[in-house]
Swiss-Prot record:
It comes from Chlamydomonas reinhardtii. Residues 125-226, 254-311, 342-408 form a coiled coil. GO terms for biological process: cell motility; cilium movement; inner dynein arm assembly. This is Cilia- and flagella-associated protein 100. Interacts with FAP73; form the modifier of inner arm (MIA) complex.
Length: 576
């Protein structure tokens, strides 16, 4: 049996207040109130306690009581309430209270009973009644659950029966579909076989047509060759006559088109003149009848002008056509013409054959002369080659001699320059100076000038001197500068952008090629490292002991000037 707390059960002495007992005296204590009533009782109890607390805070000390006195007063109030309930009703009507239910027990001998025992018995009765109600509710729930289970089982059985019926229907439908699919597959197979036979028949027909087409193409090619042959032997005057005939036809088409355009133009001008005349008559009309006639004439002329304006101008003739092959006439109308041409060609061919034989004999004689001349020229070339070798040796010796003389001249000019005390002498244009004490070779300077001369667009000529090349380069530069001054800024900007674009493209290509080469080099090094054997150190590693002594180099400052350094260099060269 479950045990409940008296304070948590509404309707008991410990869980009710004095005012609640008086208000619910006629209610059945064995009925469990609803949940909202329990919560309402709790809220009322909480509000009552808050109110009592506020009242206690405002009361005087003399009016306040202890907790024991409050409990005694509550117990006395509850006992009085129970006594009022146990008294019999005074009126003739019976009530549904607990006192009315215990009327039969009032005639028995009353024994004195303690209030606590009475409340305990009431509590036990209430708890028993609550336990019975709980069990009845559980039994009712179990019965309801069993009923729901039975209904669910019935529904499941019904669903299983329906599923079985549907499955049977599905099997039947599936069998029908299988039969239909088999019939359809047989029909498709038959149709496929028919299509295959049709394809074979069409392939056979296509092959026959293709062979016939090839035969016609061969015939057409033969006809084209015959036509080309006939055109080749046809006199040119015939083609000129055909071209003149075609031109006359084109001229006739152009003349017809021009006449149509002229007729349309005349009709428009006539309609416009009629409209102008009608307007003039309407403006000069003096009577109503004349005005009406002029107005009708204006309407008619306007309508006629609209009709004429709606007419489209004739399209110009298409002159881009050739003679129709069906209308084109052939020069050869009789076989005798071809026989005459063949005879003439045969005679000319015999003449050409005779000329070819004579030409071949002359060619053989020329070949023999060529062989003899070649043998003689080879012998002469060998002799000239020996002379060339001798001349080259002489040229080399002369160049060496000229070089020695040039070096001696440079030494003399250097001595003269030092005696004058000037580092930038006028002879520097001849000797050149790439820096302090560094003479430039005249040959290198001439080669540089010649390279610039060739890059400027001139032809390389060994007979031109360096000064002439420089003069030509200067003239070329002046010409280009004059051309650049005459150019528009837009053209110059466009050319600069194009050159800059080309330069960037070349730089980009070079960069990509460099990156590609570096990538290939890295890949090669990686492959070498991967293929190289693993180096394993053996033994004890070397330890750093002490660094070897280092000697400090003292740099002596050179206080000499450029002239002294050049003099020493010249003297050293002279001594050498």
């Amino acid at each position: 049996m479950p045990i409940y707390d008296e304070a948590s059960v509404p309707g008991t002495a410990a869980g009710r207040s004095t005012t609640d007992v008086g208000a619910t005296a006629g209610a059945n204590p064995f009925n469990i109130p609803a949940d909202e009533e329990i919560f309402r009782f709790r809220e009322e109890e909480r509000a009552r306690k808050e109110q009592d607390k506020l009242i206690a805070q405002t009361m005087r000390v003399a009016d306040k009581t202890t907790f024991a006195a409050q409990m005694q007063a509550t117990a006395t109030a509850d006992a009085r309430t129970l006594l009022r309930e146990l008294r019999p009703p005074k009126g003739p009507k019976a009530t549904t209270t607990l006192a009315a239910s215990s009327v039969g027990t009032l005639d028995r001998r009353k024994e004195k009973e303690n209030m606590a025992d009475f409340i305990a018995k009431k509590r036990e009765i209430f708890l028993l009644q609550m336990s019975l109600d709980t069990k009845r509710a559980e039994i009712k729930k179990l019965e309801e659950r069993a009923r729901q289970r039975e209904e669910a089982l019935k529904k499941s059985e019904q669903m299983l029966e329906e599923d079985a019926l549907r499955f049977d229907a599905f099997l039947k439908e599936n069998d029908e579909k299988v039969q239909e699919a088999i019939k359809k597959a047989e029909a498709e197979a038959k149709a496929k076989q028919d299509k295959v036979l049709e394809i074979k028949r069409l392939n056979t027909a296509t092959a026959a047509l293709r062979s016939e087409l090839n035969k016609y193409e061969e015939q057409l090619e033969d006809c084209r060759r015959y036509k080309e042959f006939l055109d080749s032997i046809t006199p040119p005057e015939w083609f000129e006559q055909q071209a003149a005939k075609l031109q006359r036809r084109k001229d006739a088409l152009v003349a017809e088109w021009q006449s149509q355009c002229e007729a349309l133009k005349q009709r428009r001008e006539a309609a416009l003149a009629a409209k102008t005349a009608a307007e003039s008559d309407y403006a000069n009309a003096r009577t109503q009848q004349q005005a009406e006639r002029a107005e009708r004439a204006i309407k008619e002329s306007v309508a006629a002008l609209k009709e004429i304006m709606k007419e489209k101008e004739p399209q110009p003739p298409n002159l881009d056509f050739e003679m129709d092959p069906e209308d084109e006439e052939m020069y050869f109308q009789e076989p005798g013409q071809l026989l005459a041409v063949y005879k003439q060609l045969e005679e000319s061919n015999l003449f050409y054959i005779q000329n070819a034989q004579e030409t071949e004999e002359a060619l053989e004689e020329l070949r023999q002369k060529l062989r003899d001349t070649k043998t003689r020229m080879d012998a002469e070339a060998q002799g000239l080659q020996g002379q060339v070798s001798t001349l080259q040796a002489s040229i080399v010796a002369a160049r060496e001699k000229a070089k020695r003389l040039k070096d001696r001249t440079l030494e003399n000019e250097g001595a003269f320059t030092l005696s004058m005390g000037s580092s930038n002498a006028p002879t520097s244009s001849v000797t050149g100076s790439s820096g302090p004490g560094g003479p430039v070779n005249l040959k290198e300077l001439g080669d540089k000038v010649r390279e610039v001369y060739v890059r400027c667009g001139f032809d390389a000529d060994a007979s031109i001197s360096t000064l002439q090349m420089l003069t030509n380069i200067e003239m070329k530069l002046e010409e280009y500068l004059n051309l650049a001054e005459g150019m528009t800024p837009d053209y110059v900007d466009g050319a600069e952008k194009a050159r800059e674009k080309d330069r960037r493209k070349v730089a980009r290509d070079e960069k990509l090629s460099t990156q590609h080469r570096e990538h290939e080099a890295r890949m090669a090094r990686a492959l070498e490292r991967a293929a190289a054997p693993v180096f394993k150190k053996t033994g004890k590693p070397l330890m750093f002991r002490s660094a070897p002594p280092q000697r400090k180099k003292v740099v002596q400052a050179d206080d000499r000037n450029d002239e002294e350094a050049e003099l020493e260099a010249y003297l050293a060269q002279d001594m050498i």
